[in-house]
Amino acid sequence: MPNRKASRNAYYFFVQEKIPELRRRGLPVARVADAIPYCSSDWALLREEEKEKYAEMAREWRAAQGKDPGPSEKQKPVFTPLRRPGMLVPKQNVSPPDMSALSLKGDQALLGGIFYFLNIFSHGELPPHCEQRFLPCEIGCVKYSLQEGIMADFHSFINPGEIPRGFRFHCQAASDSSHKIPISNFERGHNQATVLQNLYRFIHPNPGNWPPIYCKSDDRTRVNWCLKHMAKASEIRQDLQLLTVEDLVVGIYQQKFLKEPSKTWIRSLLDVAMWDYSSNTRCKWHEENDILFCALAVCKKIAYCISNSLATLFGIQLTEAHVPLQDYEASNSVTPKMVVLDAGRYQKLRVGSSGFSHFNSSNEEQRSNTPIGDYPSRAKISGQNSSVRGRGITRLLESISNSSSNIHKFSNCDTSLSPYMSQKDGYKSFSSLS
């Protein structure tokens, strides 16, 4: 069998360049073949002129190997896993949004700024070699500001079109494990062109510059691809500036506090479950069917998390438009019955109940002799004059310790114990037995 060395194309050199970054992220990539599955989405977002750099590297490698490309090889297009000829592919933008315009007017401009949070669900993700990577089935978007909270929302189900041959089971399994939207014959699904036009009217009702749109960084590849796919299907060409919510929060913190929070903290801020089942968060269909995954709910929970974290720092009073107040107040309240500071606190509560009234007078007398000093109001100070703490066995052990110097007198404890416990006029500590 001949020992032929595989040819290297532009995609090979792109993956080779990404390997150090993948290793820094902790991914198990030892060679190019291991890194290929992690690079297909990034490759699809490159523009044609950016891919030309790697194509030139491939030509130089072939020339060095003595493999000048023939006529058929020169005409062969560079393999693009996610790109269809003529489809608009955006340039990946991972830099934080420009907040300099807001800095000129201070906090008021930042509080009044309008942000749009967008998410698009799909019936799973098809393998990289497929021309159609996603099948959009649901879209959600909210209009939000720090001052007003959620001002408006947009939601629609999308007709995904024809399921690629051989992937029906794959798409059905992906749907059943998440949003549970039927993959076919769903009467609520709308034409992709109609949905995209309605989305454009929602985010850009008046002439002028288009506002930036934000989504989670983990969803950006899917949302970007679906927008361009729907734009091509409807022949509507409009470049939307799709940024990440994480970068938005970084920009707000830098503008307000001149500090940059860590991306790990921001992701933990956005990935919370306290509003998963809050009322008026999911769409009507997911709410009625008690399904957790909803594109509109993802957008609203982003707004809730930002309000919960940033609104109080700007001195904004939270309203129903910022967070679901009934769930917010419940999550911040504490049931008094579950709070037991210490045994003394627990016993103090029992003293006031029936059956312990004969302890009141002596307890008040002992508490009046307790030095306060600089200790907190609920702190207990050990010593001979401190208030009674803990259970009876604790007091007995303390009395034994205090009377260790007079141990010969403690032998009479059994005979003198009964008279002290039978007295009706109050309570005397065991330390008096000595």
Curated annotation (Swiss-Prot):
Entry function: Plays a central role during spermatogenesis by repressing transposable elements and preventing their mobilization, which is essential for the germline integrity. Acts via the piRNA metabolic process, which mediates the repression of transposable elements during meiosis by forming complexes composed of piRNAs and Piwi proteins and governs the methylation and subsequent repression of transposons. Its association with piP-bodies suggests a participation in the secondary piRNAs metabolic process. Required for the localization of germ-cell factors to the meiotic nuage.
Assembly and interaction partners: Interacts with SMARCB1, SIN3B and DDX4. Interacts with piRNA-associated proteins TDRD1, PIWIL1 and PIWIL2. Interacts with TEX19.
Span list, region Disordered: 357-385
Name the record gives this protein: Protein maelstrom homolog
Cross-referenced Gene3D superfamilies: High mobility group box domain
Entry's Gene Ontology cellular component terms: autosome; chromatin; chromatoid body; cytoplasm; male germ cell nucleus; nucleus; P granule; perinuclear region of cytoplasm
Family that this chain belongs to: Belongs to the maelstrom family.
One matching Pfam family: Maelstrom
DNA-binding region(s), residue ranges: 4-73
Keyword Nucleus: yes
GO process terms (BP): cell morphogenesis; ectopic germ cell programmed cell death; fertilization; homologous chromosome pairing at meiosis; intrinsic apoptotic signaling pathway in response to DNA damage; male meiotic nuclear division; negative regulation of apoptotic process; negative regulation of developmental process
Species this chain originates from: Homo sapiens
InterPro entries (UniProt xref): HMG_box_dom, HMG_box_dom_sf, Maelstrom, Protein_maelstrom
Distribution of this protein across tissues and organs: Testis-specific. Expressed in various cancer cell lines, probably due to demethylation of its promoter.
This protein's UniProt keywords: Cytoplasm, Developmental protein, Differentiation, DNA-binding, Meiosis, Nucleus, RNA-mediated gene silencing, Spermatogenesis
CDD domains, alphabetized: HMG-box_MAEL
GO molecular function, one term: sequence-specific DNA binding
Chief subcellular location: cytoplasm
Subcellular location(s) of the protein: Cytoplasm; Nucleus
